[in-house]
Amino acid sequence: MTGLNSLDLPGRPEDTRVVVAMSGGVDSSVTAALLKEQGYDVVGITLQLYDHGAAVSRKGACCAGQDIQDARRVADQIGIPHYVLDYEDRFRRAVMDDFADSYAAGETPIPCVRCNERVKFRDLLDTARDLGAAALATGHYIASRRGAAGRELHRPRDEERDQSYFLFATTQEQLEFLRFPLGELTKPEARALADRMGLEVAGKPDSQDICFVPTGRYTTIVEKLRPGASAPGEVVHLDGRVLGRHSGIVNFTIGQRRGLGIGASEPVSEPLFVVKLDPLKRQVIVGPREALETQKLTLRDINWLGDGPFAELPGEGLKIVAKVRSTRPPVPARLFRTGEGAVVELLESEGGVAPGQACVFYDGGGGQRVLGGGWIVRTESCWQVPEAGTSRVAAPTAD
């Protein structure tokens, strides 16, 4: 289309207002500075998401007190208005409560996905519209491109910084309003731009932690919000043997090996890993590494960004590549629609896949376009538990 600016929007940059979500880090600061340099009417917004008093001096986490100050200084430096919005209450309800509930249910949550889904790309997007913006821009490393049926989500040029796993829940409506200027840049290029522009945050380290966990110990937050989640229980082997006691399933995640609480009175001949958490029985179930391998995932709450309605997915399934953890590369798979969600069958087994995590879909051709994803509710183990005698039975699934 003709008459579009660099953000794929109609009109001149100076006539186009863009709200930039500024976290105080290098990436969002470069995003704001680039758009300002290109002539856009830029407004910076920073969200205060959790207790400001507890976070003022903490560094290395998104939206901490120091980060709010950094965002304000960058906005002043590049000459744009900047606002801080107090979203503590809605963040608590939408993200922190879900985080605690997930751990109490024996899941391993991804709070960054929930934050993008329920706060940044919903409430902040509405605020941007209220301010008369034509788009909300962020510093995420992901690409948004015009497709035949609307905007599409694609993996970024810098695959080492690929954040598509955390943005799979972005809806089509949100995608039409969002822009990701760093999608075609690498992280070193973004830092070089920050240096060239003289931004104060050019050398600031990347955020690493969950923003609302001040000590890095997530169990502290879970126990505070859901005290009953720390109820003790048994550590049980897949073969039924009780090997020890634990002080609460919130202290464990799928794939964990250390700190299992197995007593010396129950010697084991092989390394054991957490393969399932049963919140109803308050059991931590352990087994060999092989029991962590899975090729079949059951998903709920599907967000579909592919062509055509998800309900019209072919009965023989759709060839895709799937990503089951943020740190793992996508693997070939097949996607099947079910009455309540979807099933993904992996062509290669993956280990340590936990309920509560996401399975993200990419196109089966080049694996670059994001087709959506869903939340893992159950995995089916590839391993079988040897019984006494010669028969073998399937290991229980993690759910």
Curated annotation (Swiss-Prot):
EC number(s) on file: 2.8.1.13
Cellular component terms per the entry's GO annotation: cytoplasm
Chain spans, region Interaction with tRNA: 161-163
Binding of ATP, residues: A21, M22, S23, G24, G25, V26, D27, S28, L47, G139
Keywords: ATP-binding, Cytoplasm, Disulfide bond, Nucleotide-binding, RNA-binding, Transferase, tRNA processing, tRNA-binding
A Pfam family reported for this protein in Swiss-Prot or TrEMBL: tRNA_Me_trans
GO molecular function, a single term: ATP binding
Catalytic reactions on record: S-sulfanyl-L-cysteinyl-[protein] + uridine(34) in tRNA + AH2 + ATP = 2-thiouridine(34) in tRNA + L-cysteinyl-[protein] + A + AMP + diphosphate + H(+)
Annotated site location: Interaction with tRNA: H140, Q357
Domain of life assignment: Bacteria
SUPFAM superfamilies: Adenine nucleotide alpha hydrolases-like
Regions that span the bilayer: none
Localisation per UniProt entry: Cytoplasm
Function: Catalyzes the 2-thiolation of uridine at the wobble position (U34) of tRNA, leading to the formation of s(2)U34.
UniProt record similarity statement: Belongs to the MnmA/TRMU family.
Name of the molecule in the record: tRNA-specific 2-thiouridylase MnmA
Organism: Parvibaculum lavamentivorans (strain DS-1 / DSM 13023 / NCIMB 13966)
